[in-house]
Structures are given as structure tokens and as C-alpha cells.
Amino acid sequence: MSTIILGIESSCDDTSAAVIKDGYLLSNVVSSQAVHEAYGGVVPELASRAHQQNIVPVVHEALKRAGVTKEELSAVAFTRGPGLMGSLLVGVSFAKGFARSLNIPMIDVNHLTGHVLAHFIKEEGEANEQPDFPFLCLLVSGGNSQIILVKAYNDMEILGQTIDDAAGEAIDKCSKVMGLGYPGGPIIDRLARQGNPKAYTFSKPHISGLDYSFSGLKTSFLYSLRDWMKEDPDFIEHHKNDLAASLEATVVDILMDKLRKAAKQYKINEVAVAGGVSANNGLRNAFREHAEKYGWKIFIPKFSYTTDNAAMIAITGYFKYQDKDFCSIEQPAYSRVTL
């Protein structure tokens, strides 16, 4: 008998539903919210309301594209956190009601675990090469920057993480200072492709171990811009490509430096990247360069699996279903939770 999992993701501003059957993805529907662009960031109340409007049609569309009826579902997996509490509650509440009405198990999924296990999403007709355990995963997004030792689907250890800002958060804030709009990551990525990554130098942290820090870079970028604009008020407009390229290169250097140390320290050559910032062209190129230079076997997700999506929640739910790792109706949402 087939195992069919419906995954639901609503941790921030993307409403998503996906269906996985026996480990293979049948559908992955994502509804993004453009309303936040005018505010320069996600407005939690608006995000929650949009999730309420979107969740039913998104789930309906996911089932339709998968060619699956709700009665065929084996379980419903949902994101329990971390994320915006209001947004999470929409997905958690819907998942509970939906599963309860069908009398099928509920599976709570850690959003961060989902990003890591996105590398195990399989699609019909594709190579679907997957990492072998143990492997390292650089999880980097607007809210997280972590180096994770992945020993099994259900056994992960954080080796290092940011002690202040996340990499994506720093990029977004620097983009905002430049007046480039929201979200800043894709804009910086686009401009950086046309700029000189060695045009400007910004400070890098000097902290021991495998932890990250990006607050110093953010401050260095801000103060440098302030000084340059005293001499040329239009400095940003005249040099935005080089600024973006230099900022991106600095962030990538910081990320890869600690990742190299982790790979050497733990003697692991299978290395993956996950999270929203893994869509960044500069970071992807750095991974390919490191693969060639250090003999790494690298795993870079499809662009559709870098940002928040329910496919990663569904595949994690699929693995937990094999272990009968279900949750109760009392399972709460958590705005803050680690791996």
C-alpha cells in the first residue's frame, strides 16, 4: 500500500502545500505574498491574513495536481516552527482539522530540518542524486546561518551557527541601506553578477570555532557607505553593482571559511547547502570551486527548494511516517525552536 503525505508550510509569508507518494514528489504549490514589498519587510498581521485566504485553495490545488483525493492520504505533515507565530498557527490549525476530519495521523516538522532534508526530494524522471550519511549541510537563510552535521534523517548536530545576524538578514539590511527594495537577497544577487567583487573591502569577523557573526559586516558596510556618500551623494547609484558584488563576496567568504574548517575537522567530503541564500549565484559558484579544489562531493538544491516550500515538509513527514513518529492534537506551534 502506498504512503501518501500531504505537507503544509506556512512559517513566514509563503503558503505552500505538497504531496509526496512513496518518496516521490507529485505536486508542490507555493503562493507568495507580494503585499509586503511596500513595507520593506514581512508584516506579521498581513502574512497571517494572507495565509488564511490562501491555505484552502493551495491545498486543493496541490491535491488536484497530484491526482490524489484527500481520502487517499496517509498523513498530514505541517511546519511547527520556527517562524512567525500567527503564520504558523494558520498552517498548524488547518493541518490538525484536516487530519482529524480524515482520521489520519498528524506529523509535526521542524522547518529547519525540512530545509536540510530537501536534498532527499525525488522527482520522477530525474537523477535524484542524494547525499550519504554523514554529510555536512550549510543552512543559510534570512533567519539562520548554521553548519549542521547530518548523521541520519532524525539525527542532526549543529556544529556552528551565527551569534548575531544571519547571513540573509545582513544582506537584506545592507540592501535596504542602499535603497534597493525588498527582498534584498535576489536584488543583490542580480546586481553582483555585473560588478567587481574585489572593488571594496568590508570587515570580516574573527571568532574562534565554527560560529558565524555578521553584525560587524553590516556595521562596516553602513559606515563605509556613509563616508563615501559624504564625498559623492550619488555614490550608491554610481557604484551599486560593485557594492553588491563586494558585499556578496564578503558574505560568501565568511560562510565558506568556516565550512572548510568543519569539513577538515570532521573529515567529511560530502557537503550540501540549503535555505533561501543557497539560491545565491555567488555561493553556488563558491561551492563548485570548493568541490574542484578540495574534492568535495557537493549537493545544491533546485531553486524551487531553496525558499520556503511544502515539498521539504512532506519529505520530512514521509521519513517520520516510516518510524510512526506522529504528534497529538495538542501539538503547539513554536516561533523559536532549534533542530
Swiss-Prot record:
One of its GO terms (cellular component) is cytoplasm. It catalyses: L-threonylcarbamoyladenylate + adenosine(37) in tRNA = N(6)-L-threonylcarbamoyladenosine(37) in tRNA + AMP + H(+). InterPro entries: ATPase_NBD, Gcp-like_dom, KAE1/TsaD, Peptidase_M22_CS, TsaD. One of its GO terms (molecular function) is iron ion binding. CDD domains: ASKHA_NBD_TsaD_bac. It comes from the Bacteria. Binds 1 Fe(2+) ion per subunit. GO terms for biological process: tRNA threonylcarbamoyladenosine modification. Required for the formation of a threonylcarbamoyl group on adenosine at position 37 (t(6)A37) in tRNAs that read codons beginning with adenine. Is involved in the transfer of the threonylcarbamoyl moiety of threonylcarbamoyl-AMP (TC-AMP) to the N6 group of A37, together with TsaE and TsaB. TsaD likely plays a direct catalytic role in this reaction. PANTHER family: TRNA N6-ADENOSINE THREONYLCARBAMOYLTRANSFERASE, TRNA N6-ADENOSINE THREONYLCARBAMOYLTRANSFERASE, MITOCHONDRIAL. Fe cation binds at H111, H115, D308. Substrate binds at L139, V140, S141, G142, G143, D172, G185, D189, N280. Its cofactor is Fe(2+). Coiled coil: none annotated. This is tRNA N6-adenosine threonylcarbamoyltransferase. Keywords: Acyltransferase, Cytoplasm, Iron, Metal-binding, Transferase, tRNA processing. The lineage of its organism: Bacteria, Pseudomonadati, Bacteroidota, Bacteroidia, Bacteroidales. Pfam families: TsaD (PF00814).
